[in-house]
Amino acid sequence: MSKLLDPKVLMAIKELSLSAKMTIDGFMSGINKSTIKGAGLEFSQYRSYQPGDDLRSLDWKMFARSDRYYIRESEVETNIAVRILIDASASMNHSDGDFTKIAYARYLGASLAYLANLQGDAIGLYVFKNSGIYSMTPKQDFQHLARLFYQLESINPEGTFTKPIHYKELFAGSQKRELLIFVTDLYQTDEEIINLLDTLNTLRHEILVFHVVSRNELELDFKGYSTFEDLETGETIQIDQAKARTAYKTKLASYLEETRIKMLDRRIFYRTICTDEPLEQALRDFLKQRSKLRI
């Protein structure tokens, strides 16, 4: 299963929808072997059909979507709306080797959308960049999912994060609580992303923040003198890696801890996720947070 969730494997698959399908097929086939039964966890749990299983337990919708036979072992209590928010500011173009943050965000967003669709949830997409917000209202059908994949593939990060708009009106939706999943590198100049989260928090939705970072960003594993460019402002700085690495890591650790506390204070689920990490844990986080939205 883990191989199908490996970013290097996903990057070799050119079609985003196929990548998402392979990822979720691998993830679902391993659910029964895992230990994700945390307290209060409730979701549609599946295992592969075995000869002798009661045919009445076959999930035909699952078969139609994945072309595989699965036995449904427990029921989802309710369907919800899942809104996937993608940061498409220029800093998401940051790369570690050939793999960028936005590429990882695409695969993560597509896999979460595919999994939510299998759960029977309505899925929406919101892409944030300087020129404004592209939005797809949540719907539950496969044509809508195909359009969502297309829009994810079309994302071209540029500029700074979206200027303040009427976020509350955009995300108010129905009276039911929803699940908002924000994939971002949290690069901001004036707390604009935190302000967005504060606004969304007033709607009393469940919010997940996946903070995308790269390994070279965490380790500063460059050699000698290097020139770094701010992808959003164009400003540059030259530093000696050997002299700066220790101080950099100390400041980075402090920043990540401060960010974690900010999210905790707002009761927002927060996880840092590196672009070389498999998607499995993020998918588990989604299922756990989704289980909280019971009507």
Task: Tell me the role of every PLM-derived stretch.
Residues 1-29, 35, 48-53, 62, ...:
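Exposed, interaction-prone extracellular/peripheral surfaces
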Residues 45:
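Acidic, metal-associated active-site segment
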Residues 58-66:
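N-terminal low-complexity, intrinsically disordered segments
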